[in-house]
């Protein structure tokens, strides 16, 4: 998006959040900053707590009395994945600390009047040097490498640009409350990888079906995290895309050069802001000078 002004903010600092809010005076805040690596959240719970819970608490405290719409991006991992087809009224029972931390974030967000919470699972084109599941599958297949796909782990992942369209519609309708948002149907992660291989014309035989039980993860994972999205479809009067339609949109944007355009645009923002990528964070010249002054 051209012509967008940006600013940096420490999301775990209430003071930093208040300064950025004062500078931009937003009418809508979309809170999607999160530590999403499930294994890393389990191994470093303190960091996960700071990023996923404390940041949300700081944000809520900063805007609780302000006339601002808050939209929070949560996760399908708040459900236990035992039976699948989860609706918003089903019991929340996260199996890992990532899911726990995101649900704690939901509870904070619920303190804000008229807030909107989306429980979702997304894939798309990343700005930073990390990959969504869709990107990882595509990169591996492009290199003609075999990959494993869980045949017994299902989900309702939705393409990010389709999700953005849904958020836009929800804003226009002033939607509030908790909603599942995913593809209108579901598939296993093995089937998801095969669908990408098929859509991008790669060898489907490179995708091998395995059981999630064959992997010794630190964090327990739900097997059936497919979502019932009827509530959202009814409120928006909008048909959510199927998994196939999401993957087709993913492919369409790939052919149009969107991944390169995203990387190019973010590089321009970094140059204009004198910001340097460092791991999952950005540091600027002021940060560097502060470190030098202490050495």
Where are these regions (language model features)?
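Amphipathic terminal alpha-helices
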Residues: 243-295
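Mid/C-terminal beta-alpha module of Rossmann-like enzyme folds, strongest
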Residues: 166, 173-219, 223, 258-266
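Substrate-binding strand-loop-helix patch
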Residues: 126-128, 153-164, 181-199, 241, ...
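Catalytic helix-loop patch of NAD(P)-dependent Rossmann-fold dehydrogenases
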Residues: 50, 54-58, 78-118, 122-125
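NAD(P)H-binding glycine-rich loop region in Rossmannoid oxidoreductase-like domains
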Residues: 11-51
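NAD(P)-cofactor binding segment of oxidoreductase domains
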Residues: 43-71
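Rossmann-fold cofactor-recognition segment
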Residues: 2-13
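NAD(P)-dependent short-chain dehydrogenase/reductase
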Residues: 107-155, 161-162, 168-169
């Amino acid at each position: 998006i051209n012509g967008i002004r940006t600013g940096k903010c420490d999301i775990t600092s209430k003071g930093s959040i208040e300064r950025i809010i004062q500078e931009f005076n937003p009418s809508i805040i979309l809170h999607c900053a999160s530590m999403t690596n499930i294994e890393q959240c389990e191994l470093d719970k303190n960091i996960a707590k700071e990023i996923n819970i404390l940041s949300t608490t700081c944000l809520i405290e900063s805007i609780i009395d302000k006339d601002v719409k808050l939209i929070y991006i949560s996760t399908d991992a708040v459900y236990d994945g035992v039976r699948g087809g989860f609706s918003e009224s089903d019991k929340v029972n996260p199996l890992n600390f990532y899911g726990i931390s995101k649900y704690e974030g939901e509870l904070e967000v619920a303190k804000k009047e008229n807030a909107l919470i989306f429980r979702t699972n997304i894939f798309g084109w990343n700005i930073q040097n990390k990959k969504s599941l869709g990107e990882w599958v595509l990169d591996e297949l492009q290199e003609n490498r075999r990959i494993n796909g869980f045949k017994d782990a299902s989900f309702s992942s939705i393409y990010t640009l389709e999700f953005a369209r849904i958020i836009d519609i929800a804003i226009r309708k002033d939607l509030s409350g908790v909603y599942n948002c995913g593809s209108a149907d579901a598939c296993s992660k093995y089937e998801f990888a095969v669908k990408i291989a098929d859509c991008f014309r790669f060898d489907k035989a490179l995708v091998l079906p395995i059981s999630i039980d064959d992997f010794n993860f630190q964090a327990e994972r739900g097997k059936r995290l497919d979502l019932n999205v009827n509530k959202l479809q009814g409120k928006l009067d909008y048909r959510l895309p199927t998994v196939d339609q999401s993957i087709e949109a993913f492919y369409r944007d790939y052919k149009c050069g969107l991944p390169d355009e995203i990387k190019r645009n973010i590089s321009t923002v970094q140059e204009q802001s004198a910001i340097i990528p460092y791991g999952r964070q950005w540091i600027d010249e002021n940060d560097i000078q502060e470190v030098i002054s202490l050495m």
